[in-house]
Amino acid sequence: MIELRHVSHHYDERPVLRPLSLTLRERRIGVVGSNGSGKSTFARLLNALLLPAAGQVLVDGLDTRQDPKGVRRKVGFVFQNPDHQIVFPVVEEDLAFGLKNLKLPPAEVEARIGEVLERYDLGEYRQHPSHLLSGGQKQLLAISGVLVMRPEYVVFDEPTTLLDLRNRNRVAAAIRELPQTAIVVTHDLDLLRDFERVLVFEAGELIADAPPAEALRVYRERMTWP
């Protein structure tokens, strides 16, 4: 369970997230809003990429201020641009890096890497140069790099924005099939059809928190204002 208690945030005294309290328990949660609405700030607060200016973010009881490393072990984060996460020249090296930091036995490292590569049909690319992967393959590698660490929650920030339709569908399927809780910031409303809950942000405020049909109705109405 992720809990926000009276959380707010600002940049240079400009409020970007107004006081917010809520609890996230559902397995699939979408987050939408126009550019600058506060949705990406909200996402980054969930795994301690940002710390709140005020209030508390608790992940299974861990406070992001007091134990940010512990929170990041529980909450993985997938960026919009996979190049922000792919730092090694070979696919296998990229997946192994975080696991070696955990000081796992070599057999466990090998098993985890094999598992994620098989899941996303990347097995034949194990020794492939990372920069030669397609856009969709890079995003799947970024997701694999998070999942190989076995977090309990995964936050996605616009995971399909840079992809063509074919690769968008591959990444959308990967998100749907995740065993972990997924919290997805997106403009791709079709991605959210089967989600349990959608949060709508506008100008730093949460203006809707409902099942997809109701939340997206509010979002579309706001987006079509004159």
Swiss-Prot record:
InterPro entries: AAA+_ATPase, ABC_transporter-like_ATP-bd, ABC_transporter-like_CS, ABC_transpr_CbiO/EcfA_su, ECF_ABC_transporter_ATP-bd, P-loop_NTPase. It is an enzyme of class 7 (translocase). Its main location: membrane. GO terms for molecular function: ATP binding; ATP hydrolysis activity; ATPase-coupled transmembrane transporter activity. Keywords: ATP-binding, Cell membrane, Membrane, Nucleotide-binding, Translocase, Transport. It is a peripheral membrane protein. Its EC number is 7.-.-.-. SMART domains: AAA (SM00382). The keyword Transferase does not apply. Residues 2-225 form the ABC transporter domain. One of its GO terms (cellular component) is ATP-binding cassette (ABC) transporter complex. It is found in: Cell membrane. ATP binds at G33, S34, N35, G36, S37, G38, K39, S40. It holds the Pfam family ABC_tran. It comes from the Bacteria. Probably part of an ABC transporter complex. Responsible for energy coupling to the transport system. Belongs to the ABC transporter superfamily. This is Putative ABC transporter ATP-binding protein DR_2469.
